[in-house]
């Protein structure tokens, strides 16, 4: 009940205390692109904590700290807490007032906070998702938004089912303004859908429920095709191929290997291999892939079975700055803007924006800034697989300045003094360039790891 009461309070008060929504904007040289360039926003991992409030007892600032002392709580949050509503609102206000024209937005899941299971309920989870949805709809009434469910967008967390549920039905009703009847139907049944972009009729968004493949999800243990999503995905991609459409894949839990760990996939390995096979088969149709979940900023390049790069994948950093007490690093809040060619939907560039949380709390105003422009920062031509693969090759150079920048951006410029030793670098680079188990293992063995594993 405490979370429900706090949820109501945060919504009633936040609209009246929106201090200092100062907007940077696009860099000099005028990054407001000509109409020949299409744009879309990507936001992820909002993780609203309705209980967040400033109090002298730092163990009670937020439920998401789980009793730990909040380190330096301010109006826009704390690194041991999930997002206060004021932080989330500042992100969307920045987007609204940035001056950037966008065709649509993708929103890749995880609205509720990281709190113990007994502190949430199905109704509370639905209430949080409802709040985030209505916030977006009120600020962007004419923008088509494509959501994907996250592992926390359910109760109990991670246990997203293979059949219809109260949550699936609720989000299907909430997201009707953005989706057609067929998309709503599959969303109700399994938490996934495909939908054409209204402003770009030859571009289709496929929103996958990759939480079905997530390790902690016991609802899908020993199932070869949970909710028949693989079968549906292949059929949808095949239809897009026949109809000469291009597809952007969006989901919460990404494919591939976690860049901060050794030999750990973000989802169960069997499902990862199956998805990789499908993505390789239809790489000519898929023009980009976009994920969340890790809270970090990373790229991946999918290669075909001959080793040629065929797909670009982007994992976006979270809006929430939360970390556990055991973690040394976290991320500043981040949101991003992609640019694409509206003729063929090839990805051209990405502008990453961030909020320096320490500075925002100190000044009492949220000044979102441009962190980097991907092509300019790394001196590459575009965001095509060949360009990203070439960049990853540059990362392998000893003391690569390119990689030093990449690793700082991995944490959204949270701590520029952070370093990545040889083993850390191996995990990062192999995760970028190798998404399947055989090539990933070969990468670690041949290039970096001296011992057998």
UniProtKB/Swiss-Prot annotation:
InterPro entries: ASM-like_Pdiesterase_prd (IPR017064), ASM_C (IPR045473), ASMase/PPN1_MPP (IPR041805), Calcineurin-like_PHP_ApaH (IPR004843), Metallo-depent_PP-like (IPR029052). N-glycosylation is required for protein maturation, secretion and phosphodiesterase activity. Its EC number is 3.1.4.-, 3.6.1.15. Pfam families: ASMase_C, Metallophos. GO terms for molecular function: ATP hydrolysis activity; phosphoric diester hydrolase activity; zinc ion binding. Glycans are attached at residues 69, 131, 222, 238, 263, 356, 437. Changing residue 69 to Q: Impaired protein maturation and secretion. Binds 2 Zn(2+) per subunit. Monomer. Homodimer; homodimerizes following 2',3'-cGAMP-binding. Cyclic-nucleotide phosphodiesterase that acts as a negative regulator of innate immunity by mediating degradation of 2',3'-cGAMP, thereby inhibiting the cGAS-STING signaling. Specifically linearizes 2',3'-cGAMP into 2'5'-bond pGpA and further hydrolyzes pGpA to produce GpA. Also has in vitro nucleotide phosphodiesterase activity with nucleoside triphosphates, such as ATP. Has in vitro activity with p-nitrophenyl-TMP. Has lower activity with nucleoside diphosphates, and no activity with nucleoside monophosphates. Has in vitro activity with CDP-choline, giving rise to CMP and phosphocholine. Belongs to the acid sphingomyelinase family. This is Cyclic GMP-AMP phosphodiesterase SMPDL3A. It comes from Homo sapiens.
């Amino acid at each position: 009940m405490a979370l429900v009461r706090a949820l109501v309070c945060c919504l009633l008060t936040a609209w009246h205390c929106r201090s200092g929504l100062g907007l940077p904007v696009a860099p000099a040289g005028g990054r407001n692109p000509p109409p020949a360039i299409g744009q879309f926003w990507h936001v992820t991992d909002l993780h609203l904590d309705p209980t967040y409030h400033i109090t002298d007892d730092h163990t009670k600032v937020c439920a998401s700290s789980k009793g730990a002392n909040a380190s330096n709580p301010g109006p826009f949050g704390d690194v041991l807490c999930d997002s206060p509503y004021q932080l989330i609102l500042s992100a969307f206000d920045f987007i609204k007032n940035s001056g950037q024209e966008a065709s649509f937005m993708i929103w890749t899941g995880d609205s509720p906070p990281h709190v113990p299971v007994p502190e949430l309920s199905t109704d509370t989870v639905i209430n949080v998702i409802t709040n985030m949805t209505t916030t977006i709809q009120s600020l962007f009434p004419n923008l088509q938004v494509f959501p994907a469910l996250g592992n926390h967008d359910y109760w109990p967390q991670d246990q997203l089912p293979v059949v219809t549920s109260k949550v699936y039905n609720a989000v299907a009703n909430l997201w009707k303004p953005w989706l057609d009847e067929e998309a709503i139907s599959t969303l109700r049944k399994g938490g996934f859908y495909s939908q054409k972009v209204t402003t770009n009729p030859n571009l289709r968004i496929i929103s996958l429920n990759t939480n079905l493949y997530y390790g902690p999800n016991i609802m899908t243990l020993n199932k070869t095709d949970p909710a028949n999503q693989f079968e549906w995905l292949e059929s949808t991609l095949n239809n897009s191929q026949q109809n000469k459409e291009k597809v952007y894949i969006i989901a919460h839990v990404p494919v591939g290997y976690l860049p901060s760990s050794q030999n750990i996939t973000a989802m169960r390995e069997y499902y990862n291999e199956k998805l990789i096979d499908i993505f390789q088969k239809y790489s000519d149709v898929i023009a980009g892939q976009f994920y969340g979940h890790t809270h970090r900023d990373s790229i991946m390049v999918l290669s075909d079975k001959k080793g040629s790069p065929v797909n670009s994948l982007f994992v976006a950093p979270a809006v929430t700055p939360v970390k556990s007490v055991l973690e040394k690093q976290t991320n500043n809040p981040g949101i991003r803007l992609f640019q694409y060619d509206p003729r063929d939907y090839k990805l051209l560039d990405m502008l990453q924006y961030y909020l320096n949380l320490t500075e925002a709390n100190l000044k009492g105003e949220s000044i979102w800034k441009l962190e980097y422009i991907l092509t300019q920062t790394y001196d590459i031509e575009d965001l095509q697989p060949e360009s990203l693969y070439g960049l990853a090759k540059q990362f392998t150079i000893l003391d690569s300045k390119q990689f030093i920048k990449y690793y700082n951006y991995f944490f959204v410029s949270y701590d520029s003094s952070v370093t990545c030793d040889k083993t850390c670098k191996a995990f990062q680079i192999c995760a970028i360039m190798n998404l399947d188990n055989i090539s990933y293992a070969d990468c670690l063995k041949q290039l970096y790891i001296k011992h057998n594993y």
